[in-house]
Amino acid sequence: MGGLQPWHWVIVIAVFVLLFGAKKLPDAARSLGKSMRIFKSEIKEMQADSQSAKPDQPAAPTQIASERVPEAEPSSPDKRPA
């Protein structure tokens, strides 16, 4: 019941034919395939770039010197009426 039955696919295809027309469907499928190929090639290129950009060994942690800061005193008491 949760999956698509064959008659669901028939309805979907009929809607596409009605919306786009029989002449435009091959062009739409061709452009969709071309877009998917471009998308996949970009994903592969990004993965290759990220793998080549990773250093082999992580950098050694650096020591950070800290200084003690004196505590601040209140500048002036509130002079609002109570």
Curated annotation (Swiss-Prot):
Bias (Basic and acidic residues): 68-82
Disulphide bonds in the chain: none
Bilayer topology annotation: Single-pass membrane protein
UniProt cross-references to Pfam families, sorted A to Z: TatA_B_E
Gene Ontology molecular functions: protein transmembrane transporter activity
Localization annotation: Cell membrane
GO biological process per UniProt: protein transport by the Tat complex
Protein origin, superkingdom: Bacteria
Known function: Part of the twin-arginine translocation (Tat) system that transports large folded proteins containing a characteristic twin-arginine motif in their signal peptide across membranes. TatA could form the protein-conducting channel of the Tat system.
HAMAP family for this protein: TatA_E
Subunit structure: The Tat system comprises two distinct complexes: a TatABC complex, containing multiple copies of TatA, TatB and TatC subunits, and a separate TatA complex, containing only TatA subunits. Substrates initially bind to the TatABC complex, which probably triggers association of the separate TatA complex to form the active translocon.
Similarity remark: Belongs to the TatA/E family.
Protein name (database record): Sec-independent protein translocase protein TatA
